[in-house]
C-alpha cells in the first residue's frame, strides 16, 4: 500500500530546482538515485494491467526502479538476500557488534567516501578476526556479516558498521568448534584500541599515497604534516565498539538482519508532512532515553534532499560484506565444516526451491487471483546523446 507521503513526492516537487542550482556539484550516482526514486512505480517505468480471474476487476501495477537507495524497493531485495543467507546460519547464539567512526574521522570520510568506507570495513573486520584468533580470547576463526550504514536517525553523516557474528568459531587447527561465553564474545575495549590503531595507521598511509582529497575548510589537510597534526588528538580518544548480547536463535538473527541489511537513510513511514514550512519527519535522539528519545524535526526541502543524497554510496560500492568463515571463497566448505563440528545436519543447497508464492496482491473486490492481461511500455525517455561537433575546418552537413 502506498504511503500518504513519500520521499519521491519531495524529489518530484523540489528535485528539478535543486539539481539546477547545484549543476556540476552532484555526482552521477546521486542523479541516478534521484531519477530512479522519482520514477519508481510510475508510468515512466512501464508496468502491466492485471485482471481478476473471478470478478473481472482490473488494476494497473507499475514497475519498481530497484535502486538500492529507493525507500520503496528494499523490502523485496531484503527478502531475496535473507533467503540466500538462511543456509549459512548455525544453531548458536549470534552477537551484534557495531564499529563507529569518531566525528573527526567522519568529516574526513565525507569527501573521501569510497576510500574511507572501504578502510572502515577492512579495519573493523581485521580487528574482529585478529582478536578472535588470539588464544588468550577465543582462539578460533569466526564468521562475519558486515553492513555499512552512513546515517544517524536525523540523516546526519554518521558512518558505522553493523556486524552479525556467531558466538564461536572453528579452532585454528580446524578440529573442533570453540564456543564463546554465553553473553560475551570479545573484549570491547581491546577491540576499540586495535580498531583505532589499524584505522589511523592505514588512513595515514592513504594520505601519503595521495588517495585522500580535501576541499573548502578542510583543504589545509592536503599537507602531510597538517594531516598528521589533525590525527594526533584522535589517536588519544577512546574509540567505542558496542556489542549486544546474543540473539535467541537463527530465526531471530534473520529477523534482525532484515532490519539492517537493506535500509536507506529514511523510510517513507517516518515522514509526517510536506508543505511550505518544509519536510517534517520522526527521528530518535539517542542522547535521550525513554519517551524523550522520540522526536520530530522539520527541514527545508532543499536541506532534506541534501541530507538524503549524502548517503548515496559511490557507484559499485558493496555495502554488505562477508569475512572469515563466511568470506565467499571458502564459505560453503567452512559452513559445512562448522555444521559437522556442531553435529547438526547439512542443508541441501541443491534441493529444488519451494515454489514462490504469487507476489501479486489478491483482488481488492473479491479476493480472487489477479493475472497479467497486458504489458504497459515505459513512457520515460532517456536523454538524447550529445551532439558531436565536427573537427576544425569541417562544415556540419
Q: What is the meaning of each model-derived region?
A:
Residues 1-397:
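Beta->alpha loop/short-helix hinge microenvironment recognizer with preference
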